[in-house]
């Protein structure tokens, strides 16, 4: 098993294993993000209005369970640590829930479909929370070295970008292969495959990582006190705002992407070509986080820079399409993904540093609780983004598997280009005000270490 050495260094195998955790996450959650909405409307036969309502309702569910799970992870005591046991137990359960979510019964009455959708989706979200919160918190428990954390998060992001690229390239062909006679069979089979990958990746992450940061034992702390401490943590609040915007922009666009290629471009297979064009830029962009961070010495400013250029390149995509100007369209797609990937690495690298800042500022360390609200913020953004898209499409006359009217097509195009592009620029402005640089962070860590020794 990997472990942190006395200098705070983390073995390569542990960094790789941590990265594989996000491979698993993306083979479940990105599959859900990119394909669940069109599965509900075009395969299961559920109305856009019901899907939109589900996305909003599920966030009230998250508002309850995310902080609870975060608090429980902080209180977990085992021979494997606080966070790693959750990967071992929750991953296989979540995989089963993933399969159940993609088990379509289009012959059921509409009310039966909606009830089944609500139950399975909410359980899936809970299962994913029980995996993703401890997984995300684990990085901060592996080391306090800011550069090592940057390397761990780079490993995570590179692995995630590879996973997303592979998933996007193979999913449509797999759905076609296994669903040649029935689309619902295709989705169910792919869900089984991805559920197995999800579980295996988290088992590997569990086996080859170790929690090395010693956390002092604390008395039981009320939620009210923890919330008060969070509100005093300015870097964390900026990171939380960034995550909400990130969730809205990323998942709203992801929910739209297959609609865009199917109905606006007129050919769903373009999605596979698009995915092939962005996979290499994704990997390079993730790897570029570290050199940009070394130049700026501020993870928030690094995220801000990547977000700005993501927005500019995404706005530019509005003027081109895959059918008439494929070279420019796919080149801009690759450029957009390059900058997005750098941002994705940076935004998650920020979070563990905010924990130390909060401990220094308030005397309270609550890794899981803080990551729970980051997760909740991301999910709130996701809910608003997907519900907003579903609501607009439903209002202006979307009909599954039919030629769409001009307004619906316009919504799909703007949801793919101008709306997320503008929001990326807003995200860049928000994160520009993140001021916890490398020098100040190292001073804080030294003060914390000296305080614990005394």
Placement of each model-derived feature along the sequence:
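Membrane-embedded alpha-helical bundles of multi-pass transporters/translocases
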Residues: 2-454
């Amino acid at each position: 098993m990997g472990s942190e050495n006395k200098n705070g260094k983390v073995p390569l195998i542990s960094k790789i294993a941590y990265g594989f955790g996000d491979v698993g996450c993306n083979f479940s959650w990105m599959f859900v993000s990119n394909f669940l909405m069109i599965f509900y409307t075009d395969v299961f036969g559920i109305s856009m209005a019901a899907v939109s309502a589900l996305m909003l309702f599920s966030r009230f569910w998250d508002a309850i369970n995310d902080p609870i799970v975060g608090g429980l992870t902080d209180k977990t005591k085992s021979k494997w640590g606080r966070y790693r046991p959750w990967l071992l137990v929750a991953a296989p359960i979540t995989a089963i829930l993933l399969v159940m979510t993609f088990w379509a019964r289009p012959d059921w009455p509409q009310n039966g479909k909606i009830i089944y959708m609500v139950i399975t989706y909410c359980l899936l979200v809970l299962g994913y929370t029980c995996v993703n919160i401890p997984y995300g918190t684990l990085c901060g428990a592996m080391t306090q070295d800011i550069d090592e954390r940057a390397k761990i998060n780079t490993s995570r992001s590179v692995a995630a970008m590879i996973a997303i690229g592979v998933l996007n390239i193979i999913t449509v062909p797999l759905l076609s292969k296994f669903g040649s006679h029935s689309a619902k069979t295709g989705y169910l089979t792919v869900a089984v495959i991805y559920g197995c990958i999800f579980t295996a990746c988290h088992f590997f992450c569990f086996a080859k990582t170790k929690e090395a940061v010693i956390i002092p034992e604390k008395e039981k702390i009320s939620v009210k006190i923890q919330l008060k401490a969070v509100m005093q943590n300015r870097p964390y609040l900026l990171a939380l705002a960034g995550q909400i915007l990130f969730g809205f922009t990323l998942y709203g666009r992801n929910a739209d992407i297959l609609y865009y290629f199917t109905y606006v471009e007129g050919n769903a297979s373009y999605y596979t070509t698009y995915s092939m064009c962005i996979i290499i830029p994704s990997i390079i962009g993730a790897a570029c986080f570290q050199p940009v961070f070394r130049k700026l010495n501020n993870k928030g400013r690094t995220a801000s820079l990547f977000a700005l250029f993501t927005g500019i390149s995404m706005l530019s995509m509005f003027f081109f399409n895959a059918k008439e100007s494929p070279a420019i369209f796919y080149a801009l797609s690759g450029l957009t993904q390059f900058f997005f990937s750098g941002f994705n690495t940076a935004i998650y690298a920020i979070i563990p540093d905010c924990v130390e800042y909060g401990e220094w500022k308030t005397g309270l360390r609550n890794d899981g609780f803080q990551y729970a609200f980051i997760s909740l913020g991301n999910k709130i953004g996701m809910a608003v983004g997907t519900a907003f898209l579903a609501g607009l499409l439903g209002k202006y006359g979307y009909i599954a598997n039919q030629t769409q009217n001009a307004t619906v097509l316009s919504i799909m195009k703007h949801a793919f280009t101008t709306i997320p592009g503008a929001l990326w620029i807003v995200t860049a402005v928000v994160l520009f005000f993140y001021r916890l640089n490398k020098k100040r962070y190292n001073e804080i860590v030294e003060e914390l270490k000296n305080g614990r020794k005394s």
